[in-house]
From Swiss-Prot:
It catalyses: ATP + H2O + 4 H(+)(in) = ADP + phosphate + 5 H(+)(out). It is a peripheral membrane protein. F-type ATPases have 2 components, CF(1) - the catalytic core - and CF(0) - the membrane proton channel. CF(1) has five subunits: alpha(3), beta(3), gamma(1), delta(1), epsilon(1). CF(0) has three main subunits: a(1), b(2) and c(9-12). The alpha and beta chains form an alternating ring which encloses part of the gamma chain. CF(1) is attached to CF(0) by a central stalk formed by the gamma and epsilon chains, while a peripheral stalk is formed by the delta and b chains. SUPFAM superfamilies: C-terminal domain of alpha and beta subunits of F1 ATP synthase (SSF47917), N-terminal domain of alpha and beta subunits of F1 ATP synthase (SSF50615), P-loop containing nucleoside triphosphate hydrolases (SSF52540). This is ATP synthase subunit alpha. Produces ATP from ADP in the presence of a proton gradient across the membrane. The alpha chain is a regulatory subunit. InterPro entries: ATP_synth_asu-like_sf, ATP_synth_asu_C, ATP_synth_asu_C_sf, ATP_synth_F1_a_nt-bd_dom, ATP_synth_F1_asu, ATPase_a/bsu_AS, ATPase_F1/V1/A1_a/bsu_N, ATPase_F1/V1/A1_a/bsu_N_sf. PANTHER family: ATP SYNTHASE SUBUNIT ALPHA, MITOCHONDRIAL. Pfam families: ATP-synt_ab, ATP-synt_ab_C, ATP-synt_ab_N. It comes from Thermosipho melanesiensis (strain DSM 12029 / CIP 104789 / BI429). GO terms for cellular component: plasma membrane; proton-transporting ATP synthase complex. It comes from the Bacteria. It is an enzyme of class 7 (translocase).
Length: 507
């Protein structure tokens, strides 16, 4: 057998051409200290701020938080008990991402997007970076569509628009979460996807909340992101950004989303803990100097996009817990200055039975007024004035023995309107129902009823409208306005039912 040297050369050449030498270069470091959810590593010379790293021996993920001259401070996103000194850390060359999309609806997840509800793995088709730049002014348009909370007092006096940031602030146990949950329940059938982020709460409280959402059929369009009090500070720190990324997915798809951060006080405390452990210099109330930026970069991501960019929206309802009514503390003042208004809840009102316990004088919505439907604008305009005058006169009336008839009439009207502002939890009202009830209140139809009978009248009147005047409600809902014809029809309906109510139940 004769071997042809030319053939051998060809075979060798083809083999050499197809040969690729793969050098797997990885920037690695060694753990020099670990504890309290923090690790310090020597090496990782080219690691970038907020880049993901992996502890090779355990597979645990971390994030490069502090870049110092001779070491890197890493926050550990998960269990740190098994990580020991001398373990290897490698760069992952990416920043943190979470799964997003409709696969997450109806699920309870941790800030890394891992399921906590025992319903199996999440089949997410897309991932989004947790930290992204907020859309610029060019990409936005003014807030012009209402986000109905279903709560009369808020929709009439402190209206929220899609794309707005409205702070809910108050002491513990004043009904802050209740407002947020009612808002989620009220989005049923309105095409708004909801993300509820629980930061530093008891796991049992979150479980009860998820159960309530299931009872009202609200989990179908809601994702719950949980970093409970038992979780590391690092997971509590990342949770709101992860929830925001999940909401942004819908916004950039041209849809409407609502994200609730409950609450950012605990978020700031978690960030303070991480910063102090990493020896960053403390400032006021021991918070680091960039705690304002911590919340501003999160809340600026809420926006109403211009139609050219899909016209989607992301509405943010951050919650802040105050200590002893002190809204002039560091974190409350920061978040008040970032948001487009606040709903201030007061313990004294709450314990007096005025629920939702909103202080109308200190609460404001800076952009939502433009988004109110015309029908609501017509009834809410004089409502604000009536209540403001009533609150002014109420204090004065306590000292005065004799009041002139005009003052007495204003106080009478105010008392009935305040009673009308009360609302049960988990019972949001449609906008046309709110308009009908408030119209009766501001036009004096309730002035001669006992204050105790106002809520009974409201309940029965709404039932009467649904059964006998459904066409009227439908027209208000569809036209979003209260023209002369509809107003006359509504007035007649109120008068008819009132005479019936007085006959049956008295004044």
């Amino acid at each position: 057998m004769r071997i042809n040297p030319g053939e051998i050369v060809k075979v060798l050449e083809s083999k050499i051409e197809g040969f690729k030498e793969e050098i797997n270069l990885n920037d690695v470091g060694k753990v020099i200290q670990v504890g309290d959810g923090i690790a310090r590593a020597y090496g990782l010379n080219n690691v970038m701020a907020n880049e993901m790293v992996e502890f090779v021996e355990t597979g645990t993920i971390g994030m490069a938080f502090n870049l110092e001259e001779d070491n890197v401070g890493i926050i550990i996103l998960g269990d740190y008990k098994d990580i020991k000194e001398g373990y290897t850390v490698k760069r992952l060359n990416r920043i943190m991402q979470v799964p997003v999309g409709e696969a997450l609806l109806g699920r309870v997840v941790n800030p890394l997007g891992e399921p906590l509800d025992g319903l199996g793995p999440i089949d997410a088709k897309e991932y989004r970076d947790v930290e992204v730049k907020a859309p610029g002014v060019i990409y936005r348009k003014p807030v012009d569509t209402p986000l109905q909370t279903g709560i009369k007092l808020i929709d009439a006096l402190i209206p929220i628009g899609r794309g707005q940031r409205e702070l809910i602030i108050g002491d513990r146990q004043t009904g802050k979460t209740a407002i947020a949950i009612d808002t989620i329940i009220n989005q049923k059938g309105k095409g708004v996807y909801c993300i509820y982020v629980a930061i530093g709460q008891k796991a049992s409280a979150v479980a009860r909340l998820v159960d309530k959402l299931k009872q009202h059929g609200a989990m179908e369009y809601t994702t719950v992101v949980v970093a409970s009090a038992a979780d590391n500070a690092s997971l509590q720190y990342i949770a709101p950004y992860a929830g925001c990324a999940m909401g942004e997915y819908f916004m950039y798809k041209g849809k409407d989303a609502l994200v609730i951060y409950d609450d950012l006080s605990k978020h700031a405390v978690a960030y303070r803990q991480l910063s102090l452990l990493l020896r960053r210099p403390p400032g006021r109330e021991a918070y680091p100097g960039d705690v304002f930026y911590l919340h501003s970069r999160l809340l600026e991501r809420a926006a109403r996009l211009d139609d050219k960019y899909g016209g989607g929206s992301l509405t943010a309802l951050p919650i802040i817990e105050t200590q002893a009514n002190d809204i002039s503390a560091y974190i409350p003042t920061n978040v008040i200055s970032i948001t487009d208004g606040q709903i201030y809840l007061e313990p004294s009102l709450f314990y007096a039975g005025q629920r939702p316990a909103v202080n109308i004088g200190l609460s404001v919505s800076r952009v939502g007024g433009a988004a109110q439907v015309k029908a609501m604008k017509k009834v809410a305009g004089s409502l604000k004035l009536d209540l403001a005058q009533y609150q002014e006169l109420e204090t004065f009336a306590q000292f005065a023995t004799e009041l002139d008839p005009a003052t007495q009439a204003q106080i009478t009207r105010g008392q009935r309107l305040m009673e009308l502002m009360k609302q049960e939890q988990y019972s949001p009202l449609e906008v046309e129902e709110q308009v009908a009830v408030l119209y009766a209140g501001i036009n004096g139809y309730l002035d001669d009823l006992d204050v105790e009978k106002v809520r009974d009248f409201e309940k029965r009147f709404l039932q009467y409208l649904k059964e006998n005047k459904s066409e009227l409600l439908k027209q208000i809902r569809e036209t979003k306005d209260l023209n002369e014809e509809l107003e006359n029809e509504l007035r007649n309906a109120i008068e008819d039912y009132k005479s019936e109510f007085v006959k049956m139940y008295g004044k």
